[in-house]
From Swiss-Prot:
Location of this chain's protein in the cell: Cell inner membrane
Regions of compositional bias (Low complexity) in chain numbering: 246-261
UniProt protein name: NADH-quinone oxidoreductase subunit C
Similarity comment: Belongs to the complex I 30 kDa subunit family.
Gene Ontology MF term list: NADH dehydrogenase (ubiquinone) activity; NADH:ubiquinone reductase (non-electrogenic) activity; quinone binding
Enzyme category, top tier: translocase
Function in brief: NDH-1 shuttles electrons from NADH, via FMN and iron-sulfur (Fe-S) centers, to quinones in the respiratory chain. The immediate electron acceptor for the enzyme in this species is believed to be ubiquinone. Couples the redox reaction to proton translocation (for every two electrons transferred, four hydrogen ions are translocated across the cytoplasmic membrane), and thus conserves the redox energy in a proton gradient.
Principal location listed in the UniProt entry: membrane
Organism: Novosphingobium aromaticivorans (strain ATCC 700278 / DSM 12444 / CCUG 56034 / CIP 105152 / NBRC 16084 / F199)
């Protein structure tokens, strides 16, 4: 048998904002509905009382998360956001308080024990202090870490480089070698009419273009088709005198290709030899059988032994 939960699958925000603002009274500093969420900004010193009232009287039983937001242009630059959930109404609400680097926020570990780690995360990342937290220390960064990484003025490269040294056989801390420029915050959007260069964008301005070179007439090495051929100006310029000038002035016809003829080319001459012919051999090679056969070996003869020897 399927048991259905009494909480609705979808809950509306209609009338919720007015009900909660009326219940909290002077503890509410501001309230609005944005992106389908109910946002309540309460007085910092009374945040514990406001959250207790929402938990006990309006059935927001669970603290789902505590988040921090940094607005460096404000005097109280940090917002601490408490995300609450009602499991019986299937509804969520966000409660916010504002603070700065030195002013602590009252802890809510007395209401939800899991708030201890959430407050430690906000302290580690943003540097927000929580008065009454029994174990307010870093939870995400390493021991001895300097600064708070989620602040807008924290450099992307950090201040210290953490690495393992093969020489020392241990983890060492070294200062970052990159140049750390001082960051300036200018929150005016360039799309709102800013007519100045934002800090860090000086290199993005293109340099003025180089002056154009003075135009000069193109140098001509000579006309490809000259109407009058170049001749000597004086007879003394050439050893041939004026006749050479007259000959140079006459147009020269282009050489034509040789006409094809149907006559056959003459045959090559017969080769001749000045050396006299060799005398014929007296005998043929076939008649020299005796000369080519090996000579016969002489036969050995033994002397007969005489009687009496």
């Amino acid at each position: 048998m399927t048991v259905l939960h009494s909480a609705p699958r979808w809950s509306s925000n209609e009338g919720v904002l007015d009900t909660l603002v009326a219940a909290l009274g002077d503890m509410v500093a501001a309230s609005r509905e944005e992106h389908g969420e109910i946002l309540l900004t309460v007085v910092r010193d009374r945040v514990e009382d406001a959250l207790r009232l929402l938990r006990d009287d309006h059935e927001y039983q669970q603290l789902m998360d505590i988040a921090g937001v940094d607005y460096p242009q404000r005097a109280e630059r940090f917002d601490v956001c408490y995300c609450l959930l009602s499991v019986t109404k299937n509804h969520r609400v966000i409660v916010k308080v504002s603070t700065d680097e030195a002013t602590p926020v009252p802890t809510v570990t007395t209401l939800w024990p899991n708030a201890g780690w959430y407050e430690r995360e906000v302290y580690d990342m943003f540097g927000v202090l929580f008065a009454g937290n029994p174990d307010l220390r870093r939870i995400l960064t390493d021991y001895g870490f300097q600064g708070h990484p989620f602040r807008k003025d924290f450099p992307l490269t950090g201040y210290v480089e953490l690495r393992y040294s093969e020489e020392d056989k241990r983890v060492v801390y070294e200062p970052v070698q990159l140049a750390q420029d001082l960051r300036q915050f200018d929150f005016m959007s360039p799309w709102e009419g800013a007519d100045y260069v934002l800090p860090g964008d000086e290199k993005a301005v293109p340099p003025p273009p180089a002056p154009a070179p003075v135009a000069t007439a193109p140098e001509t090495k000579g006309d490809a088709k000259a109407d009058v051929p170049k001749t000597t100006e004086q007879p003394a310029d050439t050893g041939a005198g004026e006749k050479a000038n007259d000959a140079a002035a006459k147009p020269v016809a282009e050489a034509a290709a040789p006409a094809a003829t149907k006559t056959d080319e003459p045959a090559a001459p017969e080769p001749t030899e000045d050396r006299p012919a060799r005398k014929p051999r007296a005998k043929k090679v076939a008649d020299t059988e005796g000369a080519t056969e090996p000579a016969a070996k002489p036969k050995r003869t033994r002397k007969k032994k005489e009687d009496g020897e």
